[in-house]
Structures are given as C-alpha cells and as structure tokens.
C-alpha cells in the first residue's frame, strides 16, 4: 500500500501524517514487531522500519545504539523483510529506511521484488541520490514501490527540484543539518525548506530529524504534510520504559499532528 493513501486521508481530515520509525530486530525481531504494532495502535499513520547497518552516516547515537544491538543479535535481511511483512499485514503503509549498501549486496531488483512481496510500500534511502539511482528507479517502477529521497536546507534549487521530482510517496525534508536525534527546538530552517519543496512538486513533504514531543509535532504539522519521529520513539525502548512509554509518546505525537 502506497503511503499516498495515508497522506490523502490526513489531508481530508485537515491534519498532518505521523510517520514513526523503529529499527527491525530491536529489542528482538519479534519484540520489534510488537513495538511497531503498539506504535500503530497508538496513532502512527505510516511506519518506517529501519534496516540496521554497520556504518550509519546520518543516524544519531540513539538509533545507532539500537541498530548495533540488533546487528549484535544477528538480525539479517530476511528478518527485516519479515518485520515489514508483519506490520504491513495490518494495513498500515510500511516503508523501509535503509542505506544503499545492503540493497546492493542483496541485489536491487531482487530486493524490490521481495519488499513488494512482503507488502512493503517502498524505500527511504538516506545515502542515495536520484542521479545514482537508475537501477532503483527502474526496480521501483517495475514493482510499484514508493521511493523517498532526502532534501536538506543546504540543497541547491536544482538538486532539490531533481530530488523532489524523483520522489514517490513523499519528500523527506531534513529540518536540521547533521545526524538524527531528538532536539529541544525544531529547526527554524524547516518551514523555508518545505516551501521550497512545494514550489518544485505537488508530492507531500514530511519533515524529520528532531521532533520529540506533541508540541513540536503540532508545530511541524502546521507547515508540513507529515511529521517523522525516530530517535524519541527508539529512546522509549532503549531507556527501559518499553511499550508503555512508547504508546504514551506515540499518542502524544498523534494528538499533536491533529491539533
């Protein structure tokens, strides 16, 4: 199921989309599936499943810790795809967030085939740019998958337009420079970046990197189509509070995008 369904539904309801990230295989494969399901039950509209990777260039310390734990426990591509399948079976659009190396190792066409077979909506590829994505563009077209690329405040107008044009599902706007992580204040650069993207495409724009509470989610949803939350949600599992804390934070964020 394409994530566009979630954006259309939210737009009809006059609210933002809540995109929630958790890595596959943390705290275990089954435990990770349970956590994502809890997040969905508490109000996440689109799930972003992380593919743990050993060299995560934009992941902040919280997501790195969870990914390292998953890798140490032996999580593999088959486990990641099983996670996607289990979550997508519930009817929630489910994207996979992955660095490009694991997809290349698996085989781009084969990965697209198996992701589609698992019910996955598509990929978010933080270290792949459209200029270097010919194989993925073809495979995503062949299997009807969404493809989400990232834009940043530093993106030139030409790069931003080309990236937005290549996206399907939504455009991922990184609201701050640097690695991921919850922050006390959302970036002042985010509204201007969203406006630049909207001048280039009619595809929805979701903002990630930094949101940690309902108030910030409401702020971002006031100018963007979607709010992406990762580190704050992963932190609920890392800090030992577990599913109750995850449910509570997700419900707060879901209320924020609806306010």
Question: What are these model-predicted stretches?
Answer:
Residues 44-56, 118-124, 129, 171-181, ...:
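Glycine-rich phosphate-binding active-site loops on the catalytic face of alpha/beta enzymes
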Residues 35, 40, 46, 51, ...:
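Active-site beta->alpha loop and helix N-cap motifs at the rims of alpha/beta catalytic domains
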Residues 195-203, 212-259:
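Alpha/beta catalytic cores of nucleotide-metabolism and tRNA/nucleoside-modifying enzymes
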Residues 72-75, 119-132, 146-155, 160-161, ...:
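Catalytic beta/alpha-barrel core
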Residues 63, 71, 150, 160-199, ...:
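Glycine/Thr-rich beta-alpha phosphate-binding loop at enzyme active sites
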Residues 60-95, 138-152, 188-205, 246-259:
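Alpha-helix-loop-beta-strand connector modules within alpha/beta enzyme cores
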Residues 29-39, 155-165, 200, 207, ...:
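Catalytic cores of alpha/beta
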Residues 1-21, 84-88:
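N-terminal amphipathic alpha-helix/helix-capping segment at the start of soluble metabolic enzymes
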């Amino acid at each position: 199921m394409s994530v566009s369904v979630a954006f259309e539904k939210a737009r009809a309801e006059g609210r933002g989309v809540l995109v929630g990230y958790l890595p596959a295989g943390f705290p275990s494969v089954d435990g990770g599936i349970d956590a994502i399901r809890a997040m969905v039950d508490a109000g996440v509209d689109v799930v972003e499943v992380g593919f743990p990777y050993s060299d995560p260039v934009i992941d902040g310390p919280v997501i790195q810790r969870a990914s390292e734990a998953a890798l140490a426990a032996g999580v593999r591509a088959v486990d990641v795809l099983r996670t996607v399948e289990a979550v997508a079976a519930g009817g929630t659009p489910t994207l996979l967030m992955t660095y490009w190396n694991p997809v290349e190792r698996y085989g781009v066409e084969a990965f697209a085939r198996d992701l589609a077979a698992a019910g996955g909506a598509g990929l978010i590829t933080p270290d792949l740019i459209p200029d270097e994505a010919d194989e993925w563009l073809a495979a995503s077209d062949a299997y009807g998958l969404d493809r989400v690329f990232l834009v940043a405040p530093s993106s030139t107008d030409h790069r931003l337009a080309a990236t937005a044009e290549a996206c399907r599902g939504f455009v991922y706007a990184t609201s701050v420079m640097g690695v991921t992580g919850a922050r006390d204040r959302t970036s002042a650069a985010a509204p201007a970046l969203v406006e630049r993207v909207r001048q280039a495409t009619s595809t929805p724009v979701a903002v990630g990197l930094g949101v940690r509470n309902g108030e910030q989610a409401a702020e971002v949803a006031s100018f963007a189509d979607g709010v992406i939350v990762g580190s704050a949600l992963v932190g609920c599992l890392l800090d030992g509070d577990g599913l109750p804390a995850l449910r509570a934070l997700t419900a707060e964020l879901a209320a924020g995008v609806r306010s």
